[in-house]
Amino acid sequence: MSDPKPTRSQGDLAEMLEMLLDKGVVVNADIAVSVGDTELLGIELRAAIASFETAAEYGLEFPTGTDMERVESAANISPDQSDPASETQSETESTNPLSDDSTPTASTSAEETK
């Protein structure tokens, strides 16, 4: 009898990771721990996973200290395209497939912050 062989190659994982970072994905998770009818613990998780280049294209928020010039040059976008204050809410909603109503993004307009 022959030894079992893996059905997946390492290339599959690399390709999947490349696609995930290239396209991006939003993770929404609601976790509740209950005993009977009493909820003891509730966790709401909202996360966007994407490469810096993809996140810059869609206007997602970056951590403090991120070298924005490097991100903008890697994503081939101009600084005014990545500035969230320069976008309107309608432009953001129509061009941002990574976000939904419950997912926070950096693309807030000046009208939203007032």
UniProtKB/Swiss-Prot annotation:
Q: According to the UniProt record, what happens if one changes D22A?
A: Mix of cylindrical and spindle-shaped gas vesicles, still interacts with GvpL
Q: Where is this region: Beta-strand 2?
A: 40-50
User: Which stretches does the entry tag as region Disordered?
Assistant: 63-114
Q: Which Pfam families match?
A: Gas_vesicle
Region named Alpha helix 3? 78-87
* Region annotated Beta-strand 1, chain positions: 25-35
The annotated regions of Polar residues compositional bias extend over 75-98
For region Alpha helix 1, the annotated ranges are 13-22
Effect ascribed to mutating Y58E: Makes no gas vesicles, decreased interaction with GvpL
Question: Where's it found, cell-wise?
Answer: Gas vesicle
Instruction: Return the Low complexity bias intervals.
Output: 99-114
Q: Which domain of life is it from?
A: Archaea
Please give the Gene Ontology molecular function terms for this protein.
Answer: structural molecule activity
Alphabetical UniProt keywords: Gas vesicle, Plasmid
Q: How does it assemble?
A: GvpF to GvpM interact with each other in vitro, and may form multi-subunit complex(es). Interacts with GvpA1.
The UniProt entry's sequence similarity note says: Belongs to the gas vesicle GvpA family.
- Functional note: Proteins GvpF to GvpM might be involved in nucleating gas vesicle formation. Mutagenesis of residues 13-61 shows that almost none of them can be substituted and still make gas vesicles. A minor component of the gas vesicle. Gas vesicles are hollow, gas filled proteinaceous nanostructures found in several microbial planktonic microorganisms. They allow positioning of halobacteria at the optimal depth for growth in the poorly aerated, shallow brine pools of their habitat.
In its miscellaneous comment, the UniProt entry states:
Encoded in a 14-gene plasmid locus called p-vac which produces predominantly short, spindle-shaped gas vesicles during all stages of growth.
Under which name does UniProt file this protein?
A: Gas vesicle protein J1
**Which species is the source of this protein?**
Halobacterium salinarum (strain ATCC 700922 / JCM 11081 / NRC-1) (Halobacterium halobium)
- Organism ancestry: Archaea, Methanobacteriati, Methanobacteriota, Stenosarchaea group, Halobacteria
